[in-house]
From Swiss-Prot:
This is Alginate biosynthesis protein AlgF. Pathway: Glycan biosynthesis; alginate biosynthesis. The keyword Signal applies. InterPro entries: AlgF (IPR035422). The keyword DNA repair does not apply. It is found in: Periplasm. One of its GO terms (biological process) is alginic acid biosynthetic process. It comes from Azotobacter vinelandii. It holds the Pfam family AlgF. Residues 1-29 form the signal peptide.
Length: 217
């Protein structure tokens, strides 16, 4: 092999190295940026919208827009700087004070003023969290569908109850004391996941809905 040919091979090798090495790193970085969401700045607060009404609703808080949330569905959590805001939920306004590193759900119901509900963070990677947000006017207990096992102890009206459990698929129901008042859709829980049961309405007509983070397309 001549010295000239060796130079050509070295140059070709360097060119391929740049293309497959550094170029690959650039492509990978771009892919990672598309795959992972931006990290919230330290001191941010987190808000989502749960729509307990029978029509599509949008909301905005500060710089974030929670748009076109379907009935009995929720948006994902969005972050913004902590502080005091006027939240616009549908056609109504709600003054809110959002603390740093806290999570909140704006709740809209037909014929009622919007509410701000706090959602304490859950950091376990081994367990799942079942949460009951009881916005009804009746104390309620979450049990297995057969009523034999209490899962979340009685939650007072406008109160919250939590229970860490192992990942599982479960058939559960709401009880008023020993009386079953609502069967719930089967629910699957994964490690590190928070699944929240929002109960709206009154004792005469309860509306329990499992609220999970929406699946992204």
């Amino acid at each position: 092999m001549t010295r000239l040919h060796r130079k050509h091979r070295i140059a070709l090798g360097l060119g391929l190295g740049l293309l497959l090495g550094f170029g690959g790193t650039t492509v990978q970085a771009a892919g990672d940026a598309a795959l992972y969401e931006a990290v919230a700045p330290k001191g941010s607060t987190f808000v989502r919208l749960y729509n307990a009404s029978n029509q599509e609703v949008s909301a905005n808080v500060g710089s974030i827009n929670l748009e076109d949330v379907s009935p009995l569905s929720s948006s994902g959590f969005e972050y913004l700087p902590a502080g005091q805001y006027s939240a616009r939920v549908g056609s109504q306004n709600l003054p809110v004070n959002l603390s740093a590193e806290h999570y909140y759900t704006l709740v809209t119901q037909s014929g009622a003023a919007p509410l701000l509900v706090e959602e304490p963070a859950f950091k376990s990677k081994q367990k799942a969290l079942l949460r009951v947000q009881n916005l009804s006017d009746k104390p309620l207990t979450l049990k297995t569908a057969d009523g034999k096992t209490e899962v979340v102890k009685s939650v007072e009206p406008k109160g919250r109850g939590d229970r860490e459990i192992n990942p599982v698929k479960a058939n559960l129901a709401l009880f008023d004391g020993e009386r079953k008042v609502a069967d719930l859709k089967p629910i699957s829980l994964a490690r590190g996941e928070v699944v929240c049961l929002y109960v709206t309405g009154t004792a005469n007509q309860l509306n329990p809905v499992w609220v999970k983070p929406p699946v992204k397309e």
